[in-house]
Amino acid sequence: MMDISLKRITSDNYEEISLLEVEEYQEDYIASNMWSLVEAAYNENYVVRGIYLLDKPVGFFMWVKENPHKIAIWRFMIDKIHQNKGLGRNALQIALNEIKKDKEIKEIEICYNPLNPVAKTFYASLGFEEIGMDKDGDDMLALIRVTQ
């Protein structure tokens, strides 16, 4: 079992999280961590977590409670040097478990670029079901219905 954990982002670790990067071809699929941290600082329903392997930062999450019963994962990334090692799968499972601790939550949503070749298979393998494109027609929406 990998020693993966999610940690709150504070004044002590925001810089190391903001320095994480995806591969160049992935940059169109996700906002920078720095921008996400700025958004979270000014929006109280935004939750940010650093993904750590042992004590080393390897990725980032941001999710938003869009209403009392729904959380949307808006950002999820693994640093380019740590991709394809199973870290993302483990981290997402930990994040889903943390989100499900809120007993009001009935839906967990994620969106992704439908042209992203890996996303559909990856998210489906963790229980997300595609429900169609977002209202702008840009991103595929996928959902986990939570049964508590």
What is each PLM-predicted segment?
Residues 4, 8-74, 79-81, 98, ...:
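Acetyl-CoA-dependent GNAT
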Residues 79-81, 85, 114-115:
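Active-site acidic-Proline motif in GNAT/NAT acetyltransferases
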Residues 82, 86-94:
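Conserved acetyl-CoA pyrophosphate-binding loop and the N-cap/start of the following alpha-helix
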Residues 89, 114-131:
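Conserved active-site alpha-helix within GNAT-family acetyltransferase domains
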Residues 99-111:
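Conserved GNAT acetyl-CoA-binding A-motif
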Residues 110-120, 136-139:
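Conserved beta-strand-loop-alpha-helix junction that forms the acyl-donor binding cleft
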Residues 139-148:
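Terminal substrate-recognition subdomain of acyl/acetyltransferases
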